[in-house]
Amino acid sequence: MIFMFGRTVSGFGSRAKRGAAPLSLSLNVTSGDLEVVGPAGGTVTAGIVDFGINITATASGGAGGYSYAWTNTEMADDDGVFSVYATGTTNASSYSGLVIAMDTSGDFGGEEHTGSYRIRCTVTDSASATATADFTLNVTGIVE
């Protein structure tokens, strides 16, 4: 309490409570393109690890106690030749093990195909807040 000129003032002013910063997520990606190369007449695979593509998520803010969930979605495949062969690790801060397959059974050699996949990480903190971040993986398929 403050006494001023015979008056009593209580509850003078207030201070906002400061909590944790909002949950946020960023991705660190080394390299970015995947190339699938192989002969006509079968299925050829290539993984992101084979090309030195490392994708790491960094969460900050929120309530802590982070859990990670990774997904991949085909965004483009003009010739319909690509598919996910293996999803890889989907519940850690780093995403690895994604393998893309290319069907070359209808090719005769010399063809080039392009596609892309959205790699998405969703982080959830211990208070169930979520944040997401995306990366586009470009895929080129070359049939020898």
Locate the predicted segments by residue:
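Surface-exposed, flexible coil segments in extracellular/virion-facing regions
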Residues: 72-106
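Short, solvent-exposed loop/edge segments of extracellular or virion-exposed proteins
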Residues: 26-46
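A short beta-strand segment in extracellular, disulfide-stabilized domains
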Residues: 46, 50-59
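Enriched but not universal
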Residues: 1-28, 142-143
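Exposed beta-strand face motif in extracellular beta-rich ectodomains
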Residues: 113-119
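C-terminal edge beta-strand
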Residues: 131-141
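Short glycine/proline-centered coil/turn motifs in the loop regions
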Residues: 60-64
